[in-house]
Swiss-Prot record:
InterPro entries: Ribosomal_uL3, Ribosomal_uL3_bac/org-type, Ribosomal_uL3_CS, Transl_B-barrel_sf. GO terms for molecular function: rRNA binding; structural constituent of ribosome. Part of the 50S ribosomal subunit. Forms a cluster with proteins L14 and L19. It comes from Bradyrhizobium diazoefficiens (strain JCM 10833 / BCRC 13528 / IAM 13628 / NBRC 14792 / USDA 110). Belongs to the universal ribosomal protein uL3 family. This is Large ribosomal subunit protein uL3. NCBIfam families: L3_bact (TIGR03625). GO terms for biological process: translation. GO terms for cellular component: cytosolic large ribosomal subunit. Residues 140-164, 212-238 are annotated as: Disordered.
Amino acid sequence: MRSGVIAQKVGMTRVFTEAGEHIPVTVLKLGNCQVVGHRTEEKNGYVALQLGSGSRKTVYMPKAERGQFAVAKVEPKRRVEEFRVTADAMIPVGAEIQADHFVVGQFVDVTGTSVGKGFAGGMKRWNFGGLRATHGVSISHRSIGSTGGRQDPGKTWKNKKMPGHMGVDRITTLNLRVVQLDVERGLILVEGAVPGSKGGWIRVRDAVKKPLPKEAPKPGKFKVAGGEAEAAAQQEGA
């Protein structure tokens, strides 16, 4: 199981195929996504890579966080997240993962924080039908109606769908196809919509419900400090 990457949502556009058909895509940008730490079975009880992306000033950063980046010899990162991997998919600390970590045509799962909508009523939040337009209904056309029973159960159950805060939820969208890659600019174009607003942080990883293409680099495509892009050679029959 390979590592994913941390990207930022740039926005949506469209690309055209050779047949003239257009494909709506979301542009994701890798902002110097580097490995900042390892999690091992012996020390932590599980195997994972800790990745960081973006840049951050150290003025208001806690000393413990500054020390973490100093040990890894990488610049302080705005966003830090962990990705579970197998032991054979570890990438050296300090390596920068590139956009061609994925291949065109493969499917990925993306996770982000949905756009906040504020306080919303039942019709917008839960797609309720509302009340009638006439026949005695006044003012309450968009209300949700009754929320409970009578004497029994004598209360409104927890998790009842009611008006409230909408959005700002952690959303995962499965099986988005990679349409194009721009390694020089660190761009990944995936087909369809990605949850979150422009500039939001997005976790991108190999799709869990689709097979990984054979041409996908293992453990990944990355660039070490002062070196060329590297990827471990995949052994035949491994």
